[in-house]
């Protein structure tokens, strides 16, 4: 095997970012670790954790060159690749390389890229070596490199930025909650420099956020740490963008780290929005560039809206007489009148003599009325005698005894 590049990190600089990495670990776990070799001309190589954010978003958790202690390139500049990438989740989905690399117990960490002698000029494998602070434990992680992926941080290098808007934590939280309610649909974002507002629209739902304008241009704003988090912006032109709602919610959540950073929205003329983590002054000088690129979601939203529109199956109204054909005169003949319906014979049944109802004898009715009355009197008499016995109990008569 031939070694192509060697990279050794400052473990203390990586340990400072352990809180930030844990905040974004849920999204970064399924992504890749990438070493940007193009940035050697801009200060040194950069290590980045790259992953997807929702439907149309790309996360870049990039470490500045200040965290690199030593860099050696054993290839010529023409043979060296622009970037090398390998999976963050390795060893049967049981070991997360990024979590181990940004851990606080690591004493030394290095990356070694190498290739087979007959494999060409591009590196094929990577070996991650870590030594821990107990001076005994040591781990090696070896895996194959992934196919070439362009550096995530260079995607917006040639884009023209026309506005930046900083959101305070309370405003970012309300916007994140609103974006989560919209699901994975498209959100139309309008930046208005005349009214100093940003409007977010998804279907019938709409949210308007205002900001305080700054007197500087977009490239001069927010170049250093943020001293005070407030809703301010530097905008020079009107722009309309379309992003995915779930990607917007994920970007706001990732870039809003408590006591570390607040989200900054960067608008580009091509319709792309980049949500960047603006580091606070209280967080200190962290070697971190965290950003989420929100790509244009207009085409996907239009396709979804076209597919969701129901087809109009109701018949169209046509002008009177359309589709009727006039019959020629020589074929028109008067239609015969329908024959009258046959008369049915009617007959009347003879009236039947009414039969008088049998008369009820008078003695039977009197007897039927007298029986219930007698029963009622007997019941009253019995009840009255019972009450008399209860009121006047029977006295026991004593017989005369002559012997007394």
Curated annotation (Swiss-Prot):
Effect of residue 355 to V: Complete loss of phosphorylation
Region (Homodimerization): 1-300
Assembly behavior: Homodimer. Two dimers can adopt a tetrameric ring-like structure. Forms a complex with the DNA-binding protein BALF2, the DNA polymerase subunit BALF5, and the alkaline exonuclease BGLF5. Interacts (via N-terminus) with BZLF1 (via bZIP domain); this interaction may inhibit BZLF1-induced transcription of the BMRF1 promoter. Interacts (via C-terminus) with host NuRD complex; this interaction is important for transcriptional activation of EBV promoters and inhibition of the ubiquitination step of DDR signaling.
Residue numbers carrying Phosphoserine: 337, 349
UniProt name for this protein: DNA polymerase processivity factor BMRF1
Annotated segments matching region Disordered: 302-404
Sequence positions bearing Phosphothreonine: 344, 355
GO annotations of cellular component type: host cell nucleus; viral tegument
Post-translational modification remark: Phosphorylated by the viral BGLF4 kinase.
């Amino acid at each position: 095997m031939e070694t192509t590049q060697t990279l050794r990190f400052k473990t203390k600089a990586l340990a400072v970012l352990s809180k930030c990495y844990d905040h974004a670990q849920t999204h970064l776990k399924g992504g890749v670790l990438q070493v940007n070799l193009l940035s050697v001309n801009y200060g040194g190589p950069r290590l980045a954790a790259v992953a997807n954010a929702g439907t149309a978003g790309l996360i870049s958790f990039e470490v500045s060159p200040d965290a690199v202690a030593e860099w050696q390139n054993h290839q010529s500049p023409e043979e060296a690749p622009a970037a090398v990438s390998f999976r963050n989740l390795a060893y049967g989905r049981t070991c997360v390389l990024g979590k181990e690399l940004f851990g606080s117990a690591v004493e030394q960490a290095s990356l070694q890229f190498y290739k087979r002698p007959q494999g060409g000029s591009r590196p094929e494998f990577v070996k991650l070596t870590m030594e821990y602070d107990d001076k005994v434990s040591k781990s090696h992680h070896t895996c194959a490199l992934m196919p070439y992926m362009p550096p995530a941080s260079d995607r917006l290098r040639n884009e023209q930025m026309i506005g930046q808007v900083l959101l305070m934590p309370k405003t970012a939280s309300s916007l994140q909650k609103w974006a989560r309610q919209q699901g994975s649909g498209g959100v139309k974002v309008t930046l208005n420099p005349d009214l100093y507002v940003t409007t977010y629209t998804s279907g019938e739902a709409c949210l308007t956020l205002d900001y305080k304008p700054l007197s500087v241009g977009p490239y001069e704003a927010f170049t250093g740490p943020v001293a005070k988090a407030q809703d301010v912006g530097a905008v020079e032109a009107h722009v309309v963008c379309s992003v995915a709602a779930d990607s917007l919610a994920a970007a706001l959540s990732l870039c809003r780290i408590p006591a570390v950073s607040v989200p900054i929205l960067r608008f580009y003329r091509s319709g792309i929005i980049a949500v960047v983590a603006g580091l606070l002054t209280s967080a200190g000088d962290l070697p971190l560039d965290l950003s989420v690129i929100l790509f244009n979601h207009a085409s996907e939203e239009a396709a979804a809206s076209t597919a969701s529109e129901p087809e109009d199956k109701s018949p169209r109204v046509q002008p009177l007489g359309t589709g009727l054909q006039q019959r020629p005169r020589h074929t028109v003949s008067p239609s015969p009148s329908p024959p009258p319906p046959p008369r049915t014979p009617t007959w009347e049944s003879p009236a039947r003599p009414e039969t008088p109802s049998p008369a009820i004898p008078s003695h039977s009715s009197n007897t039927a009325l007298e029986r219930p009355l007698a029963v009622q009197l007997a019941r009253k008499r019995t009840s009255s005698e019972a009450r008399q016995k209860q009121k006047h109990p029977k006295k026991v008569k004593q017989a005369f005894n002559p012997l007394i």
